A protein has these predicted regions:
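Short beta-strand segments within Ig-like beta-sandwich modules, predominantly Fibronectin type-III
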Residues: 83-92, 185-191, 214-220
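Helical hinge/lid and interdomain linker segments adjacent to catalytic or ligand-binding clefts
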Residues: 276-376
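Surface-exposed, short loops/turns at beta-strand junctions within beta-sandwich domains
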Residues: 97-106, 227-234
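Conserved structural position at the C-terminal beta-strand
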Residues: 113, 242-244
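Catalytic beta-strand/loop cores that center a nucleophilic Ser/Cys/Thr
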Residues: 397-471, 476-483
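Solvent-exposed loop/turn segments flanking beta-strands in beta-repeat/beta-sandwich domains
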Residues: 63-79, 161-186
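A glycine-rich, often tryptophan-bearing local segment used as a flexible ligand/cofactor-contacting loop or short
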Residues: 338-428
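Bacterial Sec-dependent N-terminal signal peptides
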Residues: 14-48, 119, 509
C-alpha cells in the first residue's frame, strides 16, 4: 500500500515538472513610438508691407504616446542632420538670419521632440517666417567727440543698435575724409556691446597726410590698427557706419573739426578772459620768441559764469573726456606757459588734466594775478602756496595794493628788478610758499584799510614761487603789467631765468 502511494506521488511530481518546463509568454514586444511636436503658430499669412523683423518669439510643445519628452531639437533654414541644436526649453526669442544682400526673405524654423529613448519626431513641426531686414543704426555721442580744434590726439564715441537685435550687427567702421576707400573696421568686443570709444594718435611724419594709430576704450588699448587720410591745418571729417549680417548699412554719421599741426614742444594756454586777452597773447608770444622759444597756442578763454565752487566750467576748447583724451593731448608738449585772468578759471582743473604731463617730466609756468583764496580751496594744494598772508581786520585792514613804479624784486636779492606799470591794483595778495627757498619774487606793496587809508607793508610779500618738486612756477602778477617803453628787455631777462634756467623750457620740435 505504501509502495503504491509512493509511485503515484513520484508520477504527479514528474508531470508538474514537465508542465513547468513548457510554460512561456505568448505575443510580440511593442516597439517605441516616436514623439509628436507642435508649434503654437503653424502658419503666417501677411502681405510684404507687414513682414516681421528678424527678432521673433517662438514657442512649441511635444508629447510622447509611450513615454515622455526629454527635450527638443531645432533648426533654422537648413534641416539636414548636423544642423539641429538641442534644448529643453519650449519657447525662446530667436534672431532669424536673412541672407546677405537680401532685404526680405522667408526663413524656415523647424523643431522636433526627442523622447526618453532618444527617438526624434520624424515629421518635425515647421513654419516659414516672412521677414524684412531692418537697417542698423549709428549715433554719435556728442560728449565724446573732438572740440572745434585739436592737435594730434583726438577721440570719438558712438553707439550702435539694430531693431532686429544687437547680435545681427556684423561690423562698425570709421573713415577720415574718404568714404570710398578709407573705411577701417573697429572691433566689437562683445555681442551685446552698444557703446564704442576710440582714440587716435596722429603721426606728423608725412608731409601732407597724417596716419593715426587707433586705441580702444577709456583704458587706451592698442589695436595695431591704423587709419589714414588726416589733413593738417585743415578741416577734417570723421565718418562712422554700421553693417548688419544681411549687409544692410546704417546711415553714415559724421563730425567735422580742425586739425592743427604741432610745431613746438612749448604750449601756451591762453586762459585770459579779459578784454585785453589778444593783446596779452601777442605780448607773451613776442617775449618768448625773443628768448628763442616758439610756441603752439590753445585758447581756453571761453566760458561765462561760474559753475561748481565758483569755478568757470572746463573750457569747450578742451575735449570733454579728460582721461585718456585731454590728459594725453596736453602731455604731447614738454612745457606749458599758462596765462589766466583769474584763479577761478581753468587752472582749477590742472591737477587732473595735467597728471600725465607731469608724469612725463613736463614743466609749467602759471601767470595770473595772486588773489586771496579760501584756505580749503584744493588749488592751494597744486600751486606753491602754503597760505595767503593774513590781515588784521580789527585794525580795519582789508587788503593790499601795488601801484605804478613799485618794484617786484628777486627774493634772493640777485637778478632783474621789474617795475609795475598797470596803474593801481587793489586785488593783489602776497602769499607764503612751502619753503623760504621756494620764494622767487617779492613785491613792494601797500596795505589798505576800509577807511581808505594806506600804509607801507613790511611783512612777507612773496608774489612768485616754485613748488618743491621744481616743475611748477606761479608768478602772481601778469607779465604784461610790467610793460613799458624799454621794459621788454627786463621782462625777457626774468623769463629767461624762470622758464629756461629754472624750468628747462626749450624749443625742440
Amino acid at each position: 500500500m505504501q509502495h503504491t502511494f509512493r509511485l503515484l506521488l513520484i508520477s504527479a511530481m514528474a508531470a508538474l515538472a514537465v508542465i513547468g518546463c513548457e510554460t512561456s509568454l505568448d505575443g510580440n514586444l511593442n516597439e517605441n513610438q516616436t514623439p509628436n511636436t507642435s508649434l503654437t503658430i503653424d502658419n503666417i499669412e501677411i502681405d510684404d508691407g507687414n513682414r516681421l523683423s528678424s527678432r521673433v518669439n517662438i514657442s512649441w510643445w511635444g508629447d510622447d504616446p509611450d513615454g515622455y519628452v526629454d527635450g527638443y531639437e531645432y533648426a533654422i533654414s537648413d534641416t539636414t542632420e548636423g544642423n539641429w541644436r538641442f534644448t529643453t526649453r519650449t519657447d525662446s526669442v530667436f534672431i532669424l538670419p536673412i541672407s546677405p544682400g537680401e532685404e526680405i526673405e522667408d526663413v524656415l524654423f523647424a523643431v522636433r521632440a526627442i523622447d526618453n529613448e532618444g527617438a526624434a519626431d520624424p515629421s518635425a513641426a515647421s513654419i516659414e517666417f516672412p521677414l524684412r531686414n531692418s537697417d542698423p543704426v549709428t549715433e554719435l555721442n556728442t560728449l565724446e567727440l573732438p572740440p572745434d580744434t585739436t592737435f594730434t590726439i583726438a577721440s570719438f564715441g558712438w553707439a550702435i543698435s539694430d531693431p532686429d537685435g544687437l547680435p545681427t550687427v556684423r561690423s562698425t567702421e570709421i573713415a577720415i575724409n574718404d568714404t570710398l576707400n578709407g573705411w577701417v573696421e573697429i572691433p566689437i568686443e562683445a555681442e551685446d556691446q552698444q557703446e564704442l570709444f576710440i582714440s587716435v594718435d596722429i603721426s606728423q611724419e608725412g608731409a601732407d597726410e597724417g596716419v593715426a594709430d587707433i586705441y580702444l576704450g577709456r583704458n587706451y588699448r592698442d589695436t595695431e590698427l591704423q587709419v589714414s587720410g588726416f589733413e593738417f591745418d585743415q578741416l577734417n571729417t570723421f565718418y562712422v557706419r554700421t553693417t548688419d549680417a544681411a549687409l544692410a548699412t546704417s546711415e553714415i554719421q559724421s563730425h567735422e573739426w580742425y586739425l592743427k599741426r604741432q610745431t613746438s614742444n612749448v604750449l601756451i594756454l591762453n586762459d585770459d578772459a579779459s578784454s585785453s586777452s589778444l593783446e596779452n597773447l601777442v605780448f607773451t608770444r613776442d617775449r618768448l620768441s625773443a628768448i628763442g622759444i616758439s610756441s603752439d597756442v590753445i585758447d581756453i578763454s571761453d566760458g561765462e559764469g561760474f559753475g561748481s565752487g565758483g569755478v568757470v566750467p572746463l573750457s569747450n576748447a578742451f575735449p570733454r573726456i579728460i582721461n585718456p583724451t585731454l590728459n594725453r593731448a596736453l602731455a604731447e608738449w614738454d612745457h606749458i606757459y599758462w596765462m589766466s585772468s583769474s584763479l577761478r578759471r581753468n587752472i582749477n582743473y590742472a591737477p587732473e588734466i595735467l597728471s600725465r604731463f607731469f608724469d612725463n617730466n613736463g614743466t609749467l609756468f602759471f601767470n595770473a594775478l595772486s588773489r586771496v583764496q579760501d584756505s580749503s580751496n584744493p588749488l592751494l594744494n597744486f600751486l606753491p602756496i602754503q597760505a595767503y598772508v593774513s590781515i588784521d581786520a580789527s585794525r580795519g585792514e582789508n587788503g593790499f595794493r601795488i601801484q605804478n613804479n613799485y618794484e617786484v624784486r628777486p627774493a634772493s636779492g640777485q637778478g632783474t628788478v621789474l617795475l609795475y606799470n598797470a596803474g593801481r591794483n587793489t586785488g593783489i595778495w602776497p602769499f607764503v610758499p612751502f619753503d623760504e627757498e621756494d620764494a622767487l619774487y617779492e613785491a613792494e606793496l601797500l596795505k589798505t584799510f576800509i577807511t581808505g587809508n594806506l600804509e607801507r607793508y613790511e611783512g612777507p610779500s612773496t608774489v612768485a614761487a616754485i613748488n618743491p618738486e621744481g616743475n611748477l612756477i606761479f608768478f602772481g602778477i601778469p607779465m604784461i603789467d610790467f610793460m613799458d617803453n624799454g621794459a621788454e628787455g627786463d621782462i625777457e631777462a626774468v623769463l629767461q631765468e624762470l622758464l629756461i634756467n629754472r624750468l628747462g623750457f626749450s624749443t625742440q620740435q
